[in-house]
């Protein structure tokens, strides 16, 4: 019996951001307890067929926690015990910032979705560096980098570079986030000239060739997606994360009129479309992290089949609860058996073969 699903109606009565804060605090506490390892047997699904080796890193499974849930790495020690193969902290900016005024996070239960306009609220790169220093985890930890609101677009590369260098030895991989709709002008940084400057400066500072990725919006046209993909090749990026939240609102059942990025089930098909486009454009040579609307094993398999090497969840995890990871991984293992693949990595892009 999934206790979370029984309790969800009660949990969803609370303000979304307050509930988030309480959950993060509880997870941070649990991660420090002697019995934290016991959670592995409850929520984990160890299966060597699901292991992914990418960028010189080993992922016990392809399912990771997307950036945004644990912005300040407060509960970073918990994610490996909840079955995740990796986790991404942030978005972190050079300067600490409070984000946008509340309310700024909204649930859309009828659509299995959420709208957020958080605005990169975080403690800043220096604080994150202090929190991560001297600690090690059993899964790869990525760091998602954003631009401070006070920093002009013309100085964006300075902002990203500061955070990158400050956190360089503390992350297993890094993500350039230029696709959040909640920081004024940020999406302009997806333009080839602006993004190219950021990537060039980061790669010049990338002495140990840490995996560097870019996270793109689902609202880009195909020409713009292709331009970003070309930049990834030009600057030797390790991959792309597809996709961030959307500003589109088509097909929603909810009549909530709030600005911000929409995540969850309504994003599922578009993000998979973008993944498939990038896979086809690069003939599978650019690793893709697929995110957007993953609630089930079927959703996860679709993204892998369309070209994703790794996956991330956030909104689906809020709706489905902590047992979701185990259910998805078990479903992927079953799909492997039915599809005749010996290992999950063989299934990447199989929709096009």
UniProtKB/Swiss-Prot annotation:
Location of the active site: 180 (nucleophile)
UniProt-annotated binding residues for FMN: 67-71, 91, 144, 177, 215, 243, 264, 293, 314-315
GO terms of molecular function: dihydroorotate dehydrogenase (quinone) activity; dihydroorotate dehydrogenase activity
Protein residues bound to substrate: 71, 116-120, 177, 182, 244-245
EC number of the protein: 1.3.5.2
Pathway: Pyrimidine metabolism; UMP biosynthesis via de novo pathway; orotate from (S)-dihydroorotate (quinone route): step 1/1
Cofactor note as given: Binds 1 FMN per subunit.
The protein's required cofactors: FMN
Chief location category: membrane
InterPro entries registered for this protein in UniProt: Aldolase_TIM (IPR013785), DHO_dehydrogenase (IPR050074), Dihydroorotate_DH_1_2 (IPR012135), Dihydroorotate_DH_2 (IPR005719), Dihydroorotate_DH_cat (IPR005720), Dihydroorotate_DH_CS (IPR001295)
Keyword Transcription: no
Protein's GO biological process: 'de novo' pyrimidine nucleobase biosynthetic process; 'de novo' UMP biosynthetic process; pyrimidine ribonucleotide biosynthetic process
Subunit structure: Monomer.
Family assignment from sequence similarity: Belongs to the dihydroorotate dehydrogenase family. Type 2 subfamily.
Function per UniProt: Catalyzes the conversion of dihydroorotate to orotate with quinone as electron acceptor.
Protein name: Dihydroorotate dehydrogenase (quinone)
Gene name per UniProt: pyrD
